[in-house]
Amino acid sequence: MASNERDAISWYQKKIGAYDQQIWEKSIEQTQIKGFKNKPKKMGHIKADLIDVDLIRGSTFAKAKPEIPWTSLTRKGLVRVVFFPLFSSWWIQVTSLRIFVWLLLLYLMQVIALVLYFMMPIVNVSEVLGPLCLMLLMGTVHCQIVSTQITRPSGNNGNRRRRKLRKTVNGDGSRENGNNSSDKARGVETLESAPLNGSFWRTLFGNRMKRVKLICNRGTETDYDSGCLHPIIKKRQCRPEIRMWQTREKAKFSDGEKGRRESFRRLGNGISDDLSSDDDGEAQTQMMILRRSVEGASSDNGCEIKSRKSILSRHLNTQVKKTTSKWCSVVRDSDSLAESEFESAAFSQGSRSGMSGGSRSLNMLRRDSESTRHDSETEDMLWDDLLHGPECRSSVTSDSEGAHVSSLHSGTKRDPKEDVFQQNHLFWLQNSSPASDRVSAIIWEGNECKKMDMSVLEISGIIMSRVNAYQQGVGYQMLGNIVTIGLAFFPFLHRLFREKNLDQLKSISAEEILTLFCGAPPVTPIIILSIINFFERLCLTWMFFFMMCVAERTYKQRFLFAKLFSHITSARKARKYEIPHFRLKKVENIKIWLSLRSFLKRRGPQRSVDVVVSSVFLLTLSIAFICCAQVLRGHKTFLNDAYNWEFLIWESALLLFLLRLASLGSETNKKYSNVSILLTEQINLYLKMEKKPNKKEQLTLVNNVLKLSTKLLKELDTPFRLYGLTMNPLIYNITRVVILSAVSGVISDLLGFNIRLWKIKS
């Protein structure tokens, strides 16, 4: 029905729009209908050394976002809380088994409390509805937090990703052979675990099964069987089979791919004599990684990067200079040549399958073939998440799996071009990239000052290690615990001090205490209901303030990131906090500085913590509105009700946390938007001009770039927003008028004269 309405709207829109058209608009529409397929096209490339405004704004370092609107997420969160046992598998997946059992116990206790209350409605209704509202609120917030994983397929993403990487290298087996001999002909030994055995070992050890390709120089290959976890030594496949497979595959390559492969082979043959020795294997590995990273980036973009030959030539000439000083030129043996041709053909076929992650797939297999270190695997997966977002592991697939993956991601609206452009924006950050930029930074080792070429990731890694080593305070955790205990005992304390004075408290009996604790005659159902309410209030309130403490810790870490970043250009403070130091005396240094700024701003939890803070902000506004309405209804009797006192306690505690978050957020913004750093660097440039007049032109260029950077930061930086919501201006003004009008009415009623706290800006 909705689609028919949209079609009808589009039809009528075109119908009435036809009466407004002139000849020029009709001709343009006809040209657009014909399309641009017949237009001449040239091969192009994207310059990876340039930056986009997204890099300064921070959107280049994309974070995971939900594909479902917040209204649907709220509805699903409420349903999953109300029918908690029916969604047990989902709750176990997004939390853990122990937490699920604890939450299930709280859920069952809440159901029992509701049943007992409806049987004997004697207890105050606020004591029953309070925990229920907290449970619904936190369940909805948690559903909003984990919403980025809803569209992902369930199961072990690591194993699925590695299965697709294997198919990337081997190609589609159905097009070559129907049996396992195709893998043997390719000379690639893959390790696949049986479903039962693999799941057993994954459950037992908690590690991903790795497929290892080890091509040894002594004619053997080492395979690891996932079923028994024992190495199996196999003889290398004969070279004629590899050559026959390569000859058969050459006929399937396009002319452009064949020329590209031959160009890389010609570049590689020039130094193969120097790189074939065992002692210089590291240089050969760097050459292969460099070749694949450059060609992989060009194949991802669908463009031919014409400048890669010159880049490769410079890198390979450097490697030749390093190796010719040690070794004389020797003729490459037939084994090395066959292995090089085999790897080149396998890589070309992987890029031909149309996958955006082909170069990274072979890069990972190359690293896995050198060693079985878990650190390199973890680092590679982190790079995958950085360069291609959270969808990368499920998006890298071969042609044969396209339908299967599309069915898994039927609800995903992610444009595949987004990953391509994201890679180009971040291509210069990759360590194996020829365009990776480094800055000459100063580090201190004791009292010694040393220089070191560092990249953005290395500098940010040092900053993050300093932040992680920072001793966090526990003041707000203690505040949350105190408020939790106070709210749990509040109904009992309110009845106790309301009905008993200080003299009567000295001679109070246990039966009277039990009666005051229950709020009714202490019969068995009432006692059970009171104990359940106390336990529910204690646990759920602690969980709520625990989430608030997590948000406060995250904001504190953001502030520390910004603080250490602002100290990078200060020699004294950089030495004090043991972080790298460099000046903005070159254009490349400014580029690194801007990129590091955006990178650190996007590190750590972002959307998940913003969801928590936004929920707390809206809860605070709601409680403030309710309190104002209660005061306006009767300010003399406002404090007679226990729930009004409870509202005031909640409002005071939430305001303390929000003030803390607001102060940390504003200070973080000030650190990142500190224009005085750029102005100081401009002064330093003028000082250098005075000392080195021969470099005046170069320093003037850097000074102009600094001025542009200052203007750009002022243009893009926005003030800190605590609520983290993208709110319509009309809705925002209405909400502000309603809340501030209520506060104005309360103050006017208490003080005796009219006062206005709001003013609508046009």
UniProtKB/Swiss-Prot annotation:
Positions where Phosphoserine occurs in the chain: S272, S276, S277, S334, S336
InterPro entries to which the protein is assigned, alphabetical: PHTF1/2, PHTF1/2_N
Cytoplasm keyword on record: no
Residue ranges with Low complexity bias: 348-361
Regions that span the bilayer: 77-97, 99-119, 121-141, 473-493, 512-532, 611-631, 645-665, 737-757
Membrane topology term: Multi-pass membrane protein
Record keyword Membrane present: yes
Sequence ranges assigned to domain PHTF in this UniProt record: 6-150
Gene Ontology annotations for the cellular component aspect, listed alphabetically: endoplasmic reticulum membrane; Golgi apparatus
Entry keyword set: Endoplasmic reticulum, Glycoprotein, Golgi apparatus, Membrane, Phosphoprotein, Transmembrane, Transmembrane helix
Pfam families tied to this protein: PHTF1-2_N (PF12129)
Glycan-carrying positions: N179, N180, N197, N431, N674, N733
Locations listed in the record: Endoplasmic reticulum membrane; Golgi apparatus, cis-Golgi network membrane
Residue ranges of the region described as Disordered: 152-188, 344-379, 393-415
Compositional bias of kind Basic and acidic residues: 365-376
Main location per the UniProt record: endoplasmic reticulum
Record's subunit section: Interacts with FEM1B.
Protein name as annotated: Protein PHTF1
Organism per entry: Bos taurus
